[in-house]
């Protein structure tokens, strides 16, 4: 009887941990905090300030290169 109880608890633990992993993966995909980084392509004007979007390359003479 004790062996069946230990086996039952082990199965519940495995099922619970796999469900936790699945839900953790789903949470990270649905999270609004994880956003795709945006950048300006070459030729666009570099914008300074708090709401600026960085260049994909570098900013030279107010143009993205």
UniProtKB/Swiss-Prot annotation:
Disulfide bond residue pairs: 39-56, 46-59, 55-64
Extra facts: Usually endopeptidases cleave the propeptide at the C-terminus of the basic doublet (Arg-37-38-Arg), but here, it seems that the endopeptidase cleaves the precursor within the doublet.
Keywords: Cleavage on pair of basic residues, Disulfide bond, Knottin, Secreted, Signal, Toxin
Domain notes for this protein: The presence of a 'disulfide through disulfide knot' structurally defines this protein as a knottin.
Record's subcellular location: Secreted
Propeptide stretches in the record: 21-36
MF (Gene Ontology): toxin activity
Signal peptide location: 1-20
Chief location bin: secreted
Source species, domain of life: Eukaryota
SUPFAM superfamilies: omega toxin-like
Family the entry assigns: Belongs to the neurotoxin 36 family. 02 subfamily.
Function: Possesses strong antiplasmodial activity against the intra-erythrocyte stage of P.falciparum in vitro. IC(50) for inhibiting P.falciparum growth is 1.15 uM. Specifically interacts with infected erythrocytes. Does not lyse erythrocytes, is not cytotoxic to nucleated mammalian cells, and does not inhibit neuromuscular function. Has neither antibacterial nor antifungal activity.
GO cellular component: extracellular region
Keyword flag Disulfide bond: yes
Tissue expression from the record: Expressed by the venom gland.
Designated name of the protein: U2-theraphotoxin-Pc1a
